From Swiss-Prot:
Residues 1-68 form a transit peptide. The lineage of its organism: Eukaryota, Viridiplantae, Streptophyta, Embryophyta, Tracheophyta. Its cofactor is Cu cation; Zn(2+). Belongs to the Cu-Zn superoxide dismutase family. The keyword DNA repair does not apply. It is an enzyme of class 1 (oxidoreductase). The gene is SODCP. It is found in: Plastid, Chloroplast. This is Superoxide dismutase [Cu-Zn], chloroplastic. Zn(2+) binds at residues 131, 139, 148, 151.
Length: 222
């Protein structure tokens, strides 16, 4: 006889017997409708009106809830001068990253603002390396197709030396292989020419001059 056999009994009811090679006694765990059979296994007695086996769950199924994955990071910028500031980065799911900038102590006017490759500040802002550039492209403006991922353009300081800006960019995620967490944000001395100034440094740095202040991007509670 096969390991699993289905037998039909008298017309008043139908019995399904499941033969188990692992047990010599039936179990009483399912319900009172389970009966002992002449086989080593379980007998299921079915109602003659339905001739079917009904299974029910003790708990109603619950709808699937999808929670948006918000990620947030912060960088505190400091340098050798009185330039300092705080930058927050926020990303919803896999959408673009919103960067909120407030930096003080700057000369009025435009200043290059970039994400650099390393979060190393052992030698001040100089040890943060070049612009973050995973795709090995030349320097450009944030809206250009050809640009470094870390090219965030210019921020503008007012007459009080304070620069406030909101930047929305899709090349600086907070998760994944190109995550910017652990890298450094740097504010520069001069205006970034966005790769169009014709200077020998335009294709690499935008000829934005020295590095006034920098800070490492780190995750923070949402």
């Amino acid at each position: 006889m096969a390991a699993h056999t289905i037998l039909a009994s008298a017309p008043s009811h139908t019995t399904f017997s499941l033969i188990s090679p692992f047990s010599s006694t039936p179990t009483n765990a399912l319900s009172s409708s389970l009966q002992s059979s002449s086989f080593n296994g379980l007998s299921f007695k079915l109602s003659p009106t339905t001739q079917s086996l009904s299974l029910s769950t003790s708990a109603a199924s619950k709808p699937l809830t999808i929670v948006a994955a918000t990620k947030k990071a912060v960088a505190v910028l400091k340098g050798t001068s009185n330039v300092e500031g705080v930058v927050t980065l926020t990303q919803e799911d896999d959408g673009p990253t919103t960067v909120n900038v407030r930096i003080s102590g700057l000369a009025p006017g435009k200043h290059g603002f970039h994400l650099h490759e390393f979060g190393d500040t052992t030698n001040g802002c100089m040890s943060t390396g070049p612009h973050f550039n995973p795709d090995k492209k030349t320097h450009g403006a944030p809206e250009d197709e050809v640009r470094h991922a870390g090219d965030l353009g210019n921020i503008v300081a007012n007459t009080d030396g304070v620069a406030e800006a909101t930047i929305v960019d899709n090349q600086i995620p907070l998760t994944g292989p190109n995550s910017v967490v652990g890298r450094a944000l740097v504010v520069h001395e001069l205006e970034d020419d966005l790769g169009k100034g014709g200077h020998e440094l335009s294709p690499t740095t935008g000829n934005a001059g020295g590095r006034l202040a920098c800070g490492v991007v780190g995750l923070t509670p949402v």
